[in-house]
Amino acid sequence: MIRKKKKVKKIRGSRTCGGGSHKKRRGAGNKGGRGMAGGHKHKWTWIIKYCPDYFGKYGFKRHPSLVKRLETINVGELEEIVLKNPDKFEKEDDKFVVDVIELGYEKVLGKGKVTIPMIVKAVEVSEKAREKIEAVGGEVVEL
């Protein structure tokens, strides 16, 4: 059986309920405002010390409509697609002709392995992808 009296019960009746002076524990007024209030005034030294970059302008964000994002595909994935359905792709001099734009992509990146020679047509091709395609006897055609 618990015989200890709760702290709240002991405190009830006293004006400040264990908060010290009546001036203390007055809410946000006691802390100099809520959050970052006073950052340019009485909390300026704190800002300078702990958040020096809080105020001011740094760079800008371009509007999403102006940002050009290319749909990308890796060389390894491209080869997988060709190997799964080889009858969908034309052949020129024993090389598969892969038009990346028809597949819904614009740029070819260099992740993965290339084992079959391909003629890859794309808007952009990374250096690594170009090296891998040409290493097995393929070609790259930038549109």
Curated annotation (Swiss-Prot):
For this protein, the record's Pfam families field holds:
Ribosomal_L27A
InterPro entries for the chain:
Rbsml_uL15_N (IPR027386), Ribosomal_uL15 (IPR030878), Ribosomal_uL15/eL18 (IPR021131), Ribosomal_uL15/eL18_sf (IPR036227), Ribosomal_uL15_CS (IPR001196)
Would you say which domain of life the source belongs to? Archaea
GO cellular component terms? large ribosomal subunit
Q: Name one GO molecular function term.
A: structural constituent of ribosome
Q: Where is this region: Disordered?
A: 1-39
Q: Which GO terms describe its biological process?
A: translation
Q: Does the keyword Ribonucleoprotein apply?
A: yes
- Where is the sequence biased in composition, kind Basic residues? 1-13
Q: Does the keyword Ribonucleoprotein apply?
A: yes
Ranges of Gly residues composition bias in the record = 29-38
Q: How does it assemble?
A: Part of the 50S ribosomal subunit.
Q: Which family does it belong to?
A: Belongs to the universal ribosomal protein uL15 family.
Question: What is the role of this chain?
Answer: Binds to the 23S rRNA.
The name of this protein is Large ribosomal subunit protein uL15
